[in-house]
Amino acid sequence: MAQLNPRQREAVRYIDGPLLVLAGAGSGKTSVITEKIAYLVNTCGINASHVAAVTFTNKAAREMKERVGRLLRGNAAEGLTVSTFHQLGLRIIRAQRKELGLKSGFSIFDAEDTRTLIRDLLIQQHGAE
């Protein structure tokens, strides 16, 4: 935590409720988040399985996982969730699959899958064009 400035250290140590960290690119947001996770687990005794860090890109999620892995001792990171919003959503859907009425092995369409399905249905309905 030595590399953090006083405001960043304050954010890491704040545990009395939600905290919003707003800062520009390259300002150390990922460092604050990873240090906060380590602080919660190592200092506050929070089980890592009760912590989730969510980001927008796979690259950022990988980087965050690597950084947290370097900060946590032993198997302290076991159960920690670090993922993208899409990965977390899919994980929740898979965990609740039965309650949602989904079959095992369901798939989620991306934009290309959707276009292909619509094209195939139009061809089926109206003939090849």
Question: Predicted segments — roles?
Answer:
Residues 1-104, 108:
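P-loop NTPase Walker
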Residues 112-129:
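Coupling/switch/interface segments within P-loop NTPase motor domains and analogous charged loops
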